[in-house]
């Protein structure tokens, strides 16, 4: 992993806190932080403003999506929030409706705290042994659940993807936007930040795990 951090000044604790967080995240996924770039641009960045980018290089197995067939199952691994996607819309909802960030959101958790949840790292949910049983994997990022999942399938592959009930955070989105479930799935992860496609015979070893759920099948 390599990082790029640019700011007005590296003085103070902000830069060190960010670097520490990157290091901790890399350790969680057994990834080496091998270098990066830091730039001070006081004429461009004011106060604590900064830009942060990261780049990860990895080896992957040869794709197995050509083995996907009718009857294979689609399993979703639950997300822990919005996962950094759809935040332009969320900010608009907050600003247009003058919603206070410190209001209660889900249970006793404040809205600001929920929105700042780090994206789940799915490395810990799957082992290298699992890869032999998985035909397709999708990290659900920008573009929502449907578009990201479709990218991992052979062209013209048909499937059924069913989310019976959206997590509570999407009631907030629907209340202020009147978006339908289909429209929400074009922007957000709908409660599942990662999907895998497996043969029906191999599905039980995944479905018995915490946060894994059957959400569809290949047609």
Predicted regions span which residues?
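Glycine-rich anion-binding loops of enzyme active sites
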Residues: 1-88, 217
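Short, compositionally biased
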Residues: 87-98
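Glycine-/charge-enriched secondary-structure boundary and capping motifs
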Residues: 13-32, 44-50, 100-116, 120-219
């Amino acid at each position: 992993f390599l990082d790029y951090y640019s700011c007005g000044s590296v003085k103070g604790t902000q830069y060190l806190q960010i670097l520490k967080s990157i290091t901790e995240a890399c350790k969680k996924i057994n990834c080496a932080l091998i270098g990066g770039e830091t730039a001070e641009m006081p004429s461009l960045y004011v106060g604590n403003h900064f830009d942060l980018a990261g780049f990860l290089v990895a080896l992957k197995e040869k794709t197995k999506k050509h083995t996907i067939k009718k009857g294979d199952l689609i399993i979703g691994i639950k997300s822990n929030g919005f996962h950094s996607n759809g935040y332009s819309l969320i900010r608009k909802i907050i600003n247009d409706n003058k919603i206070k960030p410190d209001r209660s959101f889900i249970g006793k958790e404040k809205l600001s705290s929920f929105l700042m949840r780090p994206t789940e790292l799915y490395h810990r949910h799957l082992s290298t042994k699992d890869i032999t049983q998985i035909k397709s994997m999708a990290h659900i990022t920008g573009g929502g659940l449907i578009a990201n999942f479709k990218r991992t399938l052979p062209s013209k592959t048909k499937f059924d993807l069913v989310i019976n009930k959206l997590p509570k955070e999407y009631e907030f989105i629907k209340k202020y936007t009147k978006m339908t479930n289909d429209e929400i799935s074009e922007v957000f992860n709908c409660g599942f930040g990662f999907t895998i496609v497996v043969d029906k015979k191999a599905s039980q070893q995944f479905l018995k795990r915490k946060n894994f759920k059957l959400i569809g099948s290949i047609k």
